[in-house]
C-alpha cells in the first residue's frame, strides 16, 4: 500500500478493524459453510439463508450496560428454510441464534457490567519448517491450522526416514504413504532405499492379514476415538486413515502457499489438505539438506528461522470470535438433527422456531468470555494503561507457548521485530518476552501479518511516498534507521546506520532504498512518552513505561512541561476526551451535559461521564472545557477526561526536585516531600470502592432488608433510610452499616418441640428466627456514598444484589509510591514542613528531594535533562515536545538544548544562578532549618513525577489475632487472610543479636503454632497472671516428626539419668 503523507494510525485499529471484519465478513462466511441438513427417510430439508442475516440494535448503550451490570450485545437473527419434499411445502422463519457481544468504540467488551479486552495472540504460520536439532540432524515439521496437530519428518545417522505423529508415535515414512493410499510402485526408489527393513515391511504388506494388522496398529496410533474390527478390510481402514488425515491435517490457504513455495510444488490453494506428494517432496528436500550440510555446525543457512515474524501471524479478535461461531454452528447441526428425530417420533409439526430449543450462540460466547485465557480484565488505571492493554500481544494461549517451555531464544529480540514489535516494553518476571506490545506505527492486516511503515526514497519528490512492508520482504532492502545525520559537521557525506539482511551496517545515503518515518516507531506507546529516551538504559526505560501505566489520575491534573508530542494522540484515541462531531455553538453547559446547536439549529446533547468507577477503583470523570456561547469546529475538544488537560495526557505533576541527600531520609530510593504537596492537594487522587451484598431465597425463607437490626448499636445505623439502605451523600466510617439485612434462621429443635412451645407460652420467650448479616464498612473504607444500585439478576437463581459506591479522596502520605518517567521510583519516607525544606536562592522551597545515587548506577540520565529543561520551561512559561534521538540533528543536541533554554531563563528572569558556566545545571541551595548554604552545588529542576496506584492505604496491615493454617497451625499470611508477618531465619538472627530471648520464645511457640500454649496465654492474660512456660512441643515439631515417620525414620528419646529429672512421657 502506498500513501503520500503519513499520519499516526489509530491506536485501537488492531481491535476495532478486526471486529468490523468479523461483523461484515466472518459471520456471512461461517453461515455460508453451514451444510444443508437432509433427512431422506422423512423428506425434511433444513438450511440457512446467510445472505439475509440480521443484527439487532443493542437494548442498552455501553454506559447503560455498565450501570445495570448487563452485557452489551446484539441478537443475531438468521432466516431458516424448512422444506418438506414429500408434501412439497416450504416454510421460512427468522430465528434468533443468540446474543453476540459487541465491541464498544473504545475497543472493549462489556460483559455483565465489567469491561474486558481480548489480547491478540501470535502463532506460527502453518506450513513446513526445517530445523537443525542438537544432534546435528535436520528435521522437517509440518504445522497445520490446528497448531496441536503436526507431523515431523526425521532422518537418522544412517539416512533412514521416519515420521513422528504429534511428537509421539514414530513409524516409517513409506508405511504412512502406503496407508494414505499411495501404491508401492509410485514410491521413489531413493525413498525405499532409506527405509529400515523395507523387505520385511513390503512382504508383510503383501500379505492381506498382516497388512490389515499393520494398518490397524497405525490407525490406533492416530489421536482421537476410533472403532475398528480385527477382520476389517484393509481398503476400508486405509480410507479411514485418509479421511482422518484430510480432517485433522488441514493446512489452510496460507499453509498450502507455504508448502508450495518451500517445496517447489504447484497445487491449488483450494487443496488445503496434506497430500502424499507433500510428504515425498518434504523428504526429498530433507535428504538434500542433510547431504549438503552434514554435522552439528552445518546447515544454519538452509534451516528456517522459526522466530522470524514472516513465519508468524496474529490471531486477532475476528479469528477468535469466528472460531467460536463455527463451534456454535456445529452444535446447531447436532441440535437440528435431534429435533428432527424427536419431531418424527412424537409426530409433531416441525417449524424452524420449534427446532431451536436453546440459543447456542449465547451459551458458546458466555463460555468463551468466561473461560478463555486471552480474555482479560481491562486495566483501567489510567487512559495509557487502557490503551497499552489493548495493544498487547501474547505468545501464550491455546496452541502457543507456556511460561515454562518458552526458551530464551523465543523471548529475545529478533531483527524482524524492529518497527513491528516494541523492543523495550514487555512484562517482567515469567512473562518477559512472551507478552510484547505492538509498536506505535505498526498495523496488522487482514491476514494477521504485522506491517511496518517506511518512507521510500526516490530521485524526486513524486517518487517519495510511504509504504507498509511485511516482515521478510524487507530483508533485501536497505533501510536507513533515521537516527543520525547523512551530512557530518564538516559538510562531508558520511555513512549512516542501515538495516540490511537482519544486520545493522553502515552505508552511504545514496545506497539506501527506504528509511524509517519516526525515531520512535520502534517502540510502543508507553516508551514513546518518555522524553530523552536515548539517554536511558533499556531496563529503566522498561520500568518507566510500565510505571506510567500504574499512575493514578489526580484531582488537579497537569500536563508535562517536557513531552514527546504524542500525548494528545493517545488521549484522543483512548476515548476519554469528548470531541465535537460538527460545527456549532455551545448553548448549555453543566457538569453532566453539553448542548451544541449547529448551523441548521439542530441540538446535539453530549452526556458527560461523572464519577464512574473503573475496573481498578480509580475515578473516570469528564470536565467541560467550553463555556456557553463558544463557537466550536468539528473535531474540537469539548471535555477533558480524568487524566487529560487540554486534550493531552496528564498523569502526574511538575514538581520542583533536588538531587541531594537529606539526613538519610532518601536512602535507598526513599523520597522526601514537602507538606505543600499534601495541603494543596497536589497529589490527591479520587478512588471509588464498591461494596455489595446479595439478597436471595434459601431453605428457611427470604432475606430481609430492614433498618430494625437487633443487638446493633443505633449509632452504626444512623445513615440508613426507612428501607435499611444507606443514604446517598452520607459520610461513612469503618464499622457503619451500609445495608441492614436479616437472614432467616431455622429455630432450634428444642423450641420446635411441644415442651419448647410450652416454655415459650409460660415464660414469654420468643424463638430467634433471624440472624444479623448486615453489610458493614470495613477498615480503611472511610468516604462518602455517591451511589446505591439495586441489581436484579435474570435467570432461575433469582439472586439480586445491592451495590454501594463510596468515594475516597486520598492525599499523598508516608508509604505511597511515586515515580518518574525514567524508571526512577521511590517510596515517601517523610513529609517535612515547607519551611524546613531546602530552598532556592529566590526563596522557593523544594517540593521533593531525590537521592543522587539513583542516577549513575541506573544509567537513566534522561531524568536530569528533563528536570533541567522543565526548570527553564517553568520560568519561561514554555512547554516542550521533543522527539527522542535528537542527536540525529547535531552532536550533543540534548545538552545544548537544555543549556540554551537555561541561559534564556537566566536572561528572562535576571537570576544568574539559573545558569552558571562553571557548574551548568546546578545551583546553591539553603537549608530551611538553619538558613545556611549547602557546601556543594545541587542539581535542581522541574520533574514530572507521578503517584502510583501502590498506595499504603491498601497495603498496610496489622494482626492481633486471626486464623491459623490447618496442617501447621501457624498464622496465615497476607492482608486478605488477616495474616501475620513471618519471622524468618534472618529475623531470628536479629532477635538473637539483641538478646531478646523471651520475645523470641513467644514468637516461635505460643504466638505461632503452640495450640495449648495459645489458650493458656489467653487465660493468663484475662486472669492477670504471669504467662506460663509451654511444656508440650509446638505443632511444627509434631509435623516434622510425622514427616520423618513417613520416610521410615522414628524419633525416640532415651533417659540417661532419672535423678532430679521429670518427664511426662506422652506420644508425639
Curated annotation (Swiss-Prot):
Gene3D superfamilies: 2.40.50.100, 2.40.50.150, 3.90.1100.10, DNA-directed RNA polymerase, beta subunit, external 1 domain, DNA-directed RNA polymerase, subunit 2, domain 6, RNA polymerase alpha subunit dimerisation domain, RNA polymerase Rpb2, domain 2. Keywords: Chloroplast, DNA-directed RNA polymerase, Nucleotidyltransferase, Plastid, Transcription, Transferase. Transmembrane segments: none annotated. One of its GO terms (biological process) is DNA-templated transcription. InterPro entries: DNA-dir_RNA_pol_bsu_ext_1_sf, DNA-dir_RNA_pol_su2, DNA-dir_RNAP_su2_dom, DNA-dir_RNAP_su2_hyb_sf, RNA_pol_bsu_bac, RNA_pol_bsu_CS, RNA_pol_bsu_protrusion, RNA_pol_Rpb2_2. It is found in: Plastid, Chloroplast. Its EC number is 2.7.7.6. It is an enzyme of class 2 (transferase). One of its GO terms (cellular component) is mitochondrion. GO terms for molecular function: DNA binding; DNA-directed RNA polymerase activity; ribonucleoside binding. It catalyses: RNA(n) + a ribonucleoside 5'-triphosphate = RNA(n+1) + diphosphate. PROSITE patterns: RNA_POL_BETA. DNA-dependent RNA polymerase catalyzes the transcription of DNA into RNA using the four ribonucleoside triphosphates as substrates. In plastids the minimal PEP RNA polymerase catalytic core is composed of four subunits: alpha, beta, beta', and beta''. When a (nuclear-encoded) sigma factor is associated with the core the holoenzyme is formed, which can initiate transcription. Belongs to the RNA polymerase beta chain family. This is DNA-directed RNA polymerase subunit beta. It comes from Staurastrum punctulatum (Green alga). The lineage of its organism: Eukaryota, Viridiplantae, Streptophyta, Zygnematophyceae, Zygnematophycidae.
Amino acid at each position: 500500500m502506498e500513501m503520500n503523507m503519513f499520519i499516526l494510525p489509530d491506536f485501537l485499529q488492531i481491535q476495532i478493524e478486526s471486529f468490523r471484519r468479523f461483523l461484515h465478513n466472518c459471520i456471512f462466511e461461517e453461515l455460508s459453510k453451514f451444510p444443508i441438513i437432509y433427512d431422506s427417510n422423512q423428506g425434511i430439508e433444513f438450511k440457512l439463508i446467510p445472505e439475509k442475516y440480521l443484527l439487532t440494535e443493542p437494548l442498552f448503550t455501553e454506559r447503560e450496560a455498565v450501570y445495570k451490570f448487563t452485557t452489551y450485545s446484539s441478537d443475531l437473527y438468521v432466516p431458516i428454510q424448512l422444506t418438506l419434499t414429500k408434501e412439497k411445502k416450504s416454510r421460512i422463519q427468522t430465528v434468533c441464534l443468540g446474543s453476540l457481544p459487541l465491541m464498544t468504540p473504545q475497543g472493549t467488551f462489556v460483559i455483565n457490567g465489567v469491561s474486558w479486552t481480548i489480547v491478540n495472540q501470535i502463532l506460527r504460520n502453518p506450513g513446513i519448517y526445517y530445523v537443525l536439532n542438537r544432534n546435528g540432524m535436520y528435521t522437517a515439521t509440518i504445522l497445520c491450522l490446528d497448531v496441536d496437530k503436526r507431523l515431523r519428518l526425521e532422518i537418522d545417522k544412517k539416512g533412514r526416514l521416519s515420521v513422528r505423529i504429534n511428537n509421539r508415535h514414530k513409524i516409517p515414512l513409506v508405511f504412512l504413504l502406503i496407508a494414505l493410499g499411495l501404491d508401492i510402485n509410485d514410491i521413489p526408489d531413493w525413498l525405499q532405499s532409506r527405509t529400515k527393513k523395507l523387505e520385511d515391511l513390503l512382504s508383510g504388506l503383501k500379505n492381506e492379514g498382516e497388512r490389515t494388522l499393520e494398518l490397524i496398529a497405525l490407525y490406533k496410533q492416530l489421536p482421537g476415538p476410533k472403532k475398528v474390527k480385527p477382520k476389517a478390510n484393509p481398503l476400508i481402514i486405509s480410507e479411514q486413515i485418509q479421511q482422518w488425515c484430510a480432517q485433522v491435517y488441514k493446512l489452510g490457504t496460507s499453509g498450502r502457499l507455504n508448502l508450495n513455495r518451500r517445496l517447489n510444488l504447484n497445487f491449488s490453494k483450494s487443496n488445503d489438505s496434506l497430500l502424499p506428494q507433500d510428504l515425498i517432496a518434504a523428504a526429498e528436500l530433507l535428504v538434500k539438506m542433510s547431504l549438503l550440510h552434514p554435522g552439528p555446525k552445518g546447515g544454519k543457512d538452509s534451516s528456517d528461522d522459526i522466530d522470524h515474524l514472516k513465519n508468524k501471524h496474529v490471531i486477532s479478535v475476528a479469528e477468535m470470535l469466528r472460531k467460536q461461531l463455527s463451534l456454535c454452528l456445529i452444535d446447531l447441526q447436532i441440535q437440528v438433527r435431534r429435533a428432527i428425530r424427536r419431531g418424527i417420533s412424537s409426530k409433531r409439526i416441525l417449524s424452524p422456531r420449534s427446532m431451536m430449543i436453546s440459543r447456542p450462540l449465547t451459551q458458546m460466547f458466555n463460555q468463551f468470555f468466561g473461560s478463555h485465557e486471552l480474555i482479560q480484565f481491562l486495566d483501567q488505571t489510567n487512559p495509557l494503561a487502557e490503551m497499552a492493554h489493548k495493544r498487547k500481544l501474547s505468545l501464550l494461549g491455546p496452541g502457543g507457548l507456556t511460561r515454562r517451555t518458552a526458551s530464551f531464544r523465543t523471548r529475545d529480540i529478533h531483527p524482524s521485530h524492529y518497527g513491528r514489535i516494541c523492543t523495550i516494553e514487555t512484562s517482567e518476571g515469567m512473562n518477559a518476552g512472551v507478552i510484547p506490545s505492538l509498536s506505535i506505527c505498526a498495523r496488522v492486516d487482514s491476514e494477521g501479518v504485522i506491517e511496518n511503515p517506511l518512507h521510500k526514497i526516490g530521485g524526486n519528490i513524486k517518487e517519495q511516498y510511504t509504504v507498509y512492508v511485511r516482515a521478510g520482504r524487507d530483508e533485501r532492502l536497505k533501510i536507513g534507521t533515521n537516527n543520525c545525520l547523512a551530512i557530518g559537521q564538516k559538510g562531508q557525506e558520511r555513512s549512516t546506520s542501515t538495516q540490511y539482511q537482519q544486520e545493522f551496517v553502515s552505508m552511504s545515503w545514496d545506497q539506501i532504498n527506504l528509511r524509517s518515518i519516526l525515531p520512535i516507531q520502534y517502540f510502543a506507546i508507553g516508551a514513546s512518552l518518555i522524553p530523552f529516551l536515548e539517554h536511558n538504559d533499556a531496563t529503566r526505560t522498561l520500568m518507566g513505561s510500565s510505571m506510567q501505566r500504574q499512575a493514578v489520575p489526580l484531582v488537579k491534573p497537569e500536563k508535562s512541561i517536557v513531552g514527546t508530542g504524542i500525548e494528545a494522540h493517545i488521549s484522543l484515541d483512548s476515548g476519554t476526551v469528548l470531541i465535537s462531531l460538527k460545527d456549532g455553538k455551545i448553548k448549555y453547559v453543566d457538569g453532566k451535559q453539553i448542548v451544541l446547536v449547529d448551523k441548521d439549529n439542530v441540538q446535539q446533547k453530549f452526556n458527560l461521564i461523572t464519577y464512574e468507577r473503573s475496573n481498578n477503583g480509580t475515578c473516570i470523570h469528564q470536565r467541560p472545557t467550553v463555556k456557553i456561547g463558544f463557537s466550536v469546529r468539528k473535531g474540537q475538544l469539548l471535555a477533558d477526561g480524568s487524566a487529560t488537560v487540554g486534550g493531552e495526557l496528564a498523569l502526574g505533576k511538575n514538581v520542583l526536585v533536588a538531587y541531594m541527600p537529606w539526613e538519610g531520609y532518601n536512602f535507598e530510593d526513599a523520597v522526601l516531600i514537602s507538606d505543600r504537596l499534601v495541603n494543596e492537594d497536589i497529589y490527591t487522587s479520587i478512588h471509588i470502592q464498591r461494596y455489595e451484598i446479595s439478597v436471595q431465597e434459601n431453605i428457611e425463607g427470604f432475606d430481609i432488608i430492614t433498618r430494625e437490626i437487633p443487638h446493633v448499636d443505633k449509632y452504626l445505623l444512623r445513615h440508613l433510610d426507612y428501607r435499611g439502605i444507606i443514604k446517598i451523600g452520607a459520610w461513612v466510617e469503618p464499622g457503619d452499616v451500609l445495608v441492614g439485612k436479616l437472614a432467616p434462621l431455622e429455630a432450634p429443635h428444642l423450641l420446635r418441640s411441644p415442651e419448647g412451645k410450652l416454655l415459650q407460652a409460660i415464660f414469654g420467650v420468643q424463638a430467634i428466627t433471624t440472624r444479623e448479616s448486615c453489610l458493614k464498612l470495613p477498615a480503611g473504607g472511610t468516604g462518602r456514598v455517591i451511589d446505591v444500585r439495586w441489581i436484579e439478576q435474570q435467570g432461575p437463581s433469582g439472586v439480586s444484589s445491592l451495590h454501594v459506591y463510596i468515594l475516597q479522596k486520598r492525599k499523598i502520605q508516608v508509604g505511597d509510591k511515586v515515580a518518574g518517567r525514567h524508571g526512577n521510583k521511590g517510596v515517601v519516607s517523610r513529609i517535612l514542613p515547607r519551611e524546613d525544606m531546602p530552598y532556592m536562592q529566590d526563596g522557593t522551597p523544594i517540593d521533593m528531594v531525590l537521592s543522587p545515587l539513583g542516577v549513575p548506577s541506573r544509567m537513566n540520565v534522561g531524568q536530569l535533562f528533563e528536570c533541567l529543561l522543565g526548570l527553564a520551561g517553568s520560568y519561561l512559561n514554555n512547554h516542550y515536545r521533543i522527539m527522542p534521538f535528537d542527536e540525529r540533528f547535531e552532536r550533543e543536541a540534548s545538552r545544548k538544548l537544555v543549556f540554551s533554554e537555561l541561559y534564556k531563563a537566566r536572561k528572562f528572569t535576571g537570576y544568574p544562578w539559573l545558569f552558571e558556566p562553571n557548574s551548568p545545571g546546578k545551583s546553591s541551595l539553603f537549608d530551611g532549618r538553619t538558613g545556611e548554604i549547602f557546601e556543594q552545588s545541587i542539581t535542581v529542576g522541574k520533574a514530572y513525577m507521578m503517584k502510583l496506584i501502590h498506595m499504603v492505604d491498601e497495603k498496610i496491615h496489622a494482626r492481633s489475632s486471626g486464623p491459623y493454617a490447618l496442617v501447621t497451625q501457624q498464622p496465615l499470611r497476607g492482608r486478605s487472610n488477616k495474616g501475620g508477618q513471618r519471622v524468618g531465619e534472618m529475623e531470628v538472627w536479629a532477635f538473637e543479636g539483641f538478646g531478646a530471648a523471651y520475645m523470641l520464645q513467644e514468637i516461635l511457640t505460643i504466638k505461632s503454632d503452640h495450640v495449648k500454649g495459645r489458650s493458656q496465654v489467653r487465660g493468663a492474660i484475662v486472669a492477670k497472671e504471669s504467662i506460663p512456660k509451654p511444656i508440650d512441643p509446638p505443632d511444627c515439631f509434631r509435623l516434622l516428626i510425622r514427616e520423618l515417620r513417613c520416610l521410615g525414620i522414628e524419633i525416640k528419646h532415651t533417659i540417661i539419668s532419672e535423678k532430679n529429672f521429670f518427664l511426662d512421657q506422652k506420644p508425639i
